[in-house]
Each structure stands twice: as C-alpha cells, then as structure tokens.
Amino acid sequence: MSHRDTLFSAPIARLGDWTFDERVAEVFPDMIQRSVPGYSNIISMIGMLAERFVQPGTQVYDLGCSLGAATLSVRRNIHHDNCKIIAIDNSPAMIERCSRHIDAYKAPTPVDVIEGDIRDIAIENASMVVLNFTLQFLEPSERQALLDKIYQGLNPGGALVLSEKFSFEDAKVGELLFNMHHDFKRANGYSELEISQKRSMLENVMLTDSVETHKARLHKAGFEHSELWFQCFNFGSLVALKAEDAA
C-alpha cells in the first residue's frame, strides 16, 4: 500500500542530503507521481520498447530499479522464452519493497532482485538496459564508465533507455521549464515549504546534465544512434541503440 508523501510538510531544522531510506520508500509511488511529470507515460512506454527489443534467451537490466515499476512494465511485455530480468538497487528499503511487488505479479519471466551497486554488476547478454532516473545520482565522473560498460554488455541491436531530469544550456529555457515543473508540483498539492526542503536535500546528490551532454556520452560509449523520445518540462527519456552489425 502506498502512503501519501508528507515527509517535508513541516519545517525540518537540519536538512541533510537526500537518501532513499525507509521513509522515502514508503511514500515513493505517491512522491514520484506528484513530482515527475510524465512518469507513468515513461513506465508504460518502457514496456512497449521492451516488446520491440527484448530477444529470446537474453537478459534485461533495470539499473536503479527502486520499487520495480520499470521491471514490471518490461516483464508484462516480454513474449519470448528463456529471458531474465536483473533488477538492482543499492537501497535496502527499496529492494525489500521491490521484491514484494515483483512476487505479487506472477509471470513466466524470472526476475533477480539484487541489493547492490550498479557500478559493480556485470552486464552480459543484454538485449535491453534501463536507467530510469538513476544516472543523475552517480558522480558525474563515474557516468561515462557505466555507459561504456552497458554498451559492451548489450548485444548487437540492443537498446538502452536513459531517463533523467535535465539541465539546459539555454538559461532562459532552463528557467522556464524549472518554473513550470514547480507549477506542476504545486498543482499536485505540494506546498512551497515541501518543494523548498526537498530541493535543498537533493541539490548535492542529484546533479543533472543537458540532453547534449547525455548524447555526447552515449556517442563516446559507442552507441550509433540516440535520441530523445519523451520530454515533459525538464524531465525526459532517451533511447540509445547499438548497431545490429556492431562487433
């Protein structure tokens, strides 16, 4: 059962850095729906992409799986035999709830739910990899290495879905979309205090990049094709494709 997010409705004397702890995990479904514009669309479309890209006898990786929404969307759209999904997150609270969610929905495709660091897991025989609002929580200096590893672990013709909050090289556009996102949160019932306190906790741990920076990293990793396929305000998702004739 999901609870309503009221974590920041009262003043907090000492705001530390953001963590995905038990309190956040408990309200996460409500929090993300009210905070991330287009989240439900992205989750649904990840399933549609899975239907196109997941191949028989291959693996799908959900890196930073949180409560398993993307994993479940992928699994509902796998219609091949001998596939497996590996869902990994470093938050014990998220993983505990993710396991319960996965177990509640029976399907032929097995899911390995792993508590661990996405930087340490091997990517092998992958037809699809999902990074759904995960890369932005890694140190910027570590992001290229992860994308390189993903590219190497993808089979030819495989796909990476990379969803992120974006910054913008055009400051005027960035300011507009930032303000529209805050309007979105206000419309969903968040107060100015809640918005301000959450932003203060996130500012040191969620470091955003521009779409151009993401595309440059993907190209450097070896992806022959990448494009923004979804955007709402300063949130969006890219798909990057490994060529079918890649070595």
UniProtKB/Swiss-Prot annotation:
GO terms for biological process: tRNA wobble uridine modification. The keyword ATP-binding does not apply. It catalyses: prephenate + S-adenosyl-L-methionine = carboxy-S-adenosyl-L-methionine + 3-phenylpyruvate + H2O. Keywords: S-adenosyl-L-methionine, Transferase. One of its GO terms (molecular function) is carboxyl- or carbamoyltransferase activity. InterPro entries: CmoA, Methyltransf_25, SAM-dependent_MTases_sf. Transmembrane segments: none annotated. S-adenosyl-L-methionine binds at residues 39, 64-66, 89-90, 117-118, 132, 199. CDD domains: AdoMet_MTases (cd02440). Pfam families: Methyltransf_25. Its EC number is 2.1.3.-. Catalyzes the conversion of S-adenosyl-L-methionine (SAM) to carboxy-S-adenosyl-L-methionine (Cx-SAM). NCBIfam families: carboxy-S-adenosyl-L-methionine synthase CmoA, PRK15451.1. Homodimer. This is Carboxy-S-adenosyl-L-methionine synthase. It comes from Shigella sonnei (strain Ss046). The gene is cmoA.
